[in-house]
Regions:
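Terminal, non-globular segments
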Residues: 1-185
Length: 185
């Protein structure tokens, strides 16, 4: 009984890991600014949202993404809804790519991700400048975009491994259900 309970907790943790990572990254402003590298930062929520929206995982739903954006605005001190809009724009681009893609390719996804974060950041910072008169350091934004783009490839590799583990877990749970049904018959 306890081993079954432990495995069910592990399965649940692995299934909800992208959601846990999303909220952990928006709550603590996942960044490497504490290393005192002036222009080294990357936007982990962009990578996470684009990848999991592209791969059609239902765990990371649009409602959770919207709420994570609201939390991100509160942490960063941005006007409410700006990050949510940016995150949903990224979801829209990922959904479009998912629907038009015949053969998925990490390399093509990677360059489409660059286009996506350029558009999303442009809209985000345009709104911040136009309506809220927030000063923007373009060198920091450029560094953030470049490092986010470069790190997408690395994180996509690890997310692919995690996705394969999740698919095995889902198939195992279906097999367990079939075995339980057979025992009842």
């Amino acid at each position: 009984m306890t081993s079954r309970f432990k495995t069910s907790i592990l399965k649940s943790f692995l299934l909800y890991l992208p959601l846990i990572l999303l909220f952990a990254s928006v709550f603590n402003e996942f960044d490497f600014n504490y290393l005192n590298y002036q222009y080294f930062s990357f936007n982990f929520p962009f990578i996470l949202i684009f990848y999991w929206s592209l791969k059609r995982i239902e765990i990371l739903g649009y409602g959770y993404i919207f709420i994570a954006g609201m939390f991100n605005d509160a942490v960063l001190g941005f006007p409410m809804g700006i990050s949510s809009l940016t995150y949903l724009i990224i979801c829209g681009f990922a959904a479009y790519l998912r629907n038009i893609t015949l053969r998925p390719s990490l390399f093509k996804d990677w360059f489409y991700f660059l286009f996506t974060i350029l558009v999303a950041n442009s809209i985000n910072y345009f709104l911040l400048m136009l309506f809220f008169s927030i000063e923007i350091n373009y060198y920091e934004i450029l560094g953030n975009i470049i490092f986010t783009f470069l790190f997408y490839y690395i994180f996509a590799y690890f997310f692919d491994i995690h996705r394969k583990i999740i698919s095995r877990i889902k198939s195992w749970s279906e097999e367990e259900k079939i075995l339980v049904l057979k025992k009842q018959i």
